[in-house]
Amino acid sequence: MLSDPVNTQKLIQSGNTKKSDLIAVCPTTTAAFLHAAANMDIDIITYHPTETKELLRFTRKHYRQATDRGIFFEIPYSHMLRDSSNRKKIIQISHLYHTVGKSRNVIISSGALTPLELRNPYDVANLGLLLGLSEGEARSALNLSGRSVALHAVTRKTGKCVSFIAETDKLDPEEQWKAKEITDAEERLAGEPEPKKMKMETA
């Protein structure tokens, strides 16, 4: 939890932090959020509705500062299952990410405290529609974003670039979905809007 940006440098430079593969912070104030987005050498900015007492306020510029530095925004869906107040706050911050940053670099995680709070990937992808994500953005937030944040953590620790190259037409049939995911991600990065699709359940 990060409420005061003053002492963040000591936190980031501590021995325990340097040993960590992934570094995530949870800003509980707007000042802490803006500092993390612009200055902190981290991988993830997460959100905790019960610890964050104020509505976080930031602009497209602040969001872009974070994403340009490879930082991802985590949405832990399990908070939505606990009570209506938490559900409202998670939806609110998710739609703010979409309004300000077009949901770029969003990663959906469980944040579960018990096995009962876990949901299968298909349910979580459908939940992404409620969070303001398109169908493709929801899929990306579940798989490609996780891989990207792991690669960012490697480059942050080593100072080196990591890349994987593969010819998509030579992928095995069970891996062909990766080619479509990459194409969808490239279109989103290029700024091409993807129409939202709502899956309707029939009784």
What feature does the model see in each segment?
Residues 14-18, 31-203:
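Charged catalytic cores and adjacent phosphate/nucleic-acid-binding surfaces used
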